[in-house]
Amino acid sequence: MIDHKLIIKNIEEVCKKLILRNFYLDKKKILLQDQKRKILQIEVEKLQNKRNLQSKIISKIKINNKNIDIYKNKSNKINILLNEKKQKLKKIKKEIDNYLSTIPNILDEKVPIGKDQKNNIEVKKWGSPKIYNFKIKSHVEIGEKIKYLDFSRSAKISGSRFVVMKNKISYMHRALSQFMLNLHTNQHGYEEYYVPYLVNKNMLYGTGQLPKFYNDFFYAKSFFEDIQSCYALIPTAEVPLTNLMRNEIIDENYLPIKMTSHTPCFRSEAGSYGKDTKGLIRMHQFDKVEIVQIVSPENSIKALEEITHHAERVLQLLDLPYRKILLCSGDTGFSSCKTYDLEVWMPSRNKYIEVSSCSNTSDFQSRRTKIRYRKISNKEIHLTHILNGSALAISRTLASIIENYQTKEGNIKVPKILQPYMDGLKLIK
């Protein structure tokens, strides 16, 4: 969430910055709401002062054993009016918060201006796509041929956009998660967490998924029921990891906080009808290793480069060709002020596909979750900055390995870095 005071103070500048994201701020609405809030705030304060004055008068009269009925009646009328004004103030504040929750984050100055993904900028390429002397097969063809990917049985169980993995491919899927977690905990300084896969509405609001992306989730219960008994399956471990520090004040010397978790992720893929209905690319359920950093504001720019590098190391050690993309203003996610996507090479498609998204949310998520830190120098309390990254999406990484490491016979070579995690296995056939 953007700071309300910042919007009011610099409304023209904020409007211009939000237009870059294809978001048009309703200036009239937000200024009118703020004007109502100010008037009600003043009225409440005046009535509180009147009430306090009446209380003092009543106390003095009591001491002198005089009749206080007239003053009590006056005090009661003030209290009734005060409660009415408080309710109106509460209502207008709620309206302001509701509108603020629909406004995306302000972009970093270095984000390129553009309408959509066509205007994203490639900032780096690593590795070269292999040249094959045989006809390339897709990961679906290879997996089904060796009978280790079963989409027909998964459809029987759950419908489209699911998969049943077995035998050596299931083994590699597990090995990938172990490799990623070991890399991030042993070499990159993250602490591993096991987190709930069901979260309540407040957690999704805190990380910015709600209210904008309401239709993207699978719900265990309707959110129209009691808030504490309503759950959604997590779309990413970013949600529970970030909310671990919700409503907390962290001493500055404990920053940065670096967390990682391997979880299944659940997404309805609303708006993706007909796209990638078969395969490991766009599924309702997939596994991912997530990395999250909570840092002081002055370190968040550096932290984004670091978190992206940590995701890149996974691809480099797997020897998978990829490219690093800086998202333009029109393609940057709702909560993010700056995002890099990592896209891995898919031979059967002859193109790169997204396998990681690394974002700096600045103080957008921390304002919603009230995650703050106390400075060592002056004990002042400020909002933290929060960053997150996929490191990596396991199913898509697996699909890329199957295709990039395929042999003429339709087998799959095991990347060297994964062999120790698979009892030295070198070939899946």
Swiss-Prot record:
Gene3D superfamilies, per this entry?
A: Bira Bifunctional Protein, Domain 2 (3.30.930.10), Serine-tRNA synthetase, tRNA binding domain (1.10.287.40)
Instruction: Decide whether keyword Signal is in the record.
Output: no
- Protein's name in the database: Serine--tRNA ligase
Identify which top EC class this enzyme belongs to.
Answer: ligase
| Keyword hit for tRNA processing | no
Question: What domain comment accompanies this record?
Answer: Consists of two distinct domains, a catalytic core and a N-terminal extension that is involved in tRNA binding.
Provide the reaction this enzyme catalyses: tRNA(Ser) + L-serine + ATP = L-seryl-tRNA(Ser) + AMP + diphosphate + H(+); tRNA(Sec) + L-serine + ATP = L-seryl-tRNA(Sec) + AMP + diphosphate + H(+)
